[in-house]
Amino acid sequence: MRDKLAPYLSEYVLCKGWIDNWEKLEDGKNRVLIKSPVIKEPNKNVMFDDLKLISKEHHINLFLEPKEVKGGLQRLEEIYFTGNINRYTRSDGTRDYGIHPTPYSSLHNEIDAVYEDLVNALNDDPRLFITHDNLMK
C-alpha cells in the first residue's frame, strides 16, 4: 500500500515517473502504468528536484481520457504529471491510495523549444539577435 500518501488525501501534488505500459479499457479510458513515480509537494518558488519529497513508489496507474493521450505514448518516456491524492478500494476489497490526474501545462517547455529552434536557425546571421528574455516578452 501507498501509506505515505495517506496524510495528503485530496491534496494537490507534482509527480515525475516513466511510462512503462498502457492499455485501452472497456470504458474507453487508457490505463497508463507509471513506474518509479516520485511524488512531491508543490511550491511555485522551488524547482521540481528541490521540492519536498512525499514518496517514491514502485508504480502508479493513471486512468486517462483518450484526448489526454492524443499525442501518443512512448515506453520508458519520462513524464511529469499533477493530480490529487485519492483513496480507492481494490477489487479484492483492500484500500489503497493513488493520484487522480489533473490538467497540466507544459507551455514553458514549448517556449524553450521554440527558442532553441530560433537560435539554431538564426545563429549564422549576426544581424539577427534574439535572447530568451525578448522572446518571452
Regions found by a protein language model. Give the residues of each.
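Beta-strand/loop nucleic-acid-binding surfaces
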Residues: 39-73
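Structural detector for short beta-strands of small beta-barrel domains
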Residues: 7-41
